[in-house]
Swiss-Prot record:
Belongs to the protein kinase superfamily. CMGC Ser/Thr protein kinase family. CDC2/CDKX subfamily. GO terms for cellular component: cyclin-dependent protein kinase holoenzyme complex; nucleus. One of its GO terms (biological process) is positive regulation of transcription elongation by RNA polymerase II. Coiled coil: none annotated. This is Cell division control protein 2 homolog 2. Its EC number is 2.7.11.22, 2.7.11.23. It comes from Pisum sativum (Garden pea). Residues 1-151 form the Protein kinase domain. It is an enzyme of class 2 (transferase). SUPFAM superfamilies: Protein kinase-like (PK-like) (SSF56112). InterPro entries: CDK (IPR050108), Kinase-like_dom_sf (IPR011009), Prot_kinase_dom (IPR000719), Ser/Thr_kinase_AS (IPR008271). One of its GO terms (molecular function) is RNA polymerase II CTD heptapeptide repeat kinase activity. ATP binds at residue 3. Keywords: ATP-binding, Kinase, Nucleotide-binding, Serine/threonine-protein kinase, Transferase.
Amino acid sequence: ALKEIRMDNEREGFPITAIREIKILKKLHHENVIKLKEIVTSPGPEKDDQGRPDGNKYKRLAIYMVFEYMDHDLTGLADRPGMRFTVPQIKCYMRQLLTGLHYCHVNQVLHRDIKGSNLLIDNEGNLKLADFGLARSFSNEIMQTLQIESL
């Protein structure tokens, strides 16, 4: 599966949100977290003799994040006419979701965008957290501060 990193309105280079997402995904290795396989680029604008973009030969620079393939997202499955999850399926998906979230939290990552379209499921019933575009890393100091403030 591919996720295109939009470069249309980027005056300052590679988007910081994409850098953050890539850094987070590169440190997470768990069966319930989507695997980032590689990053691929396509050519940008061709250059003229002086190294300037040639307006006649413009090709938009495209950068893609390549992920392992998953067959469905939870929202797509749930929206199918007549689709009803069984109690064992719900328990299985919840266990996988919570296991993946626990792994992220132990590794100091907050996903911050849990929703059905970001929960990917393959045909064998394996669930993976996806789309870490809003995710943030945190430190132990922040967690200790939050715990003290909540007392």
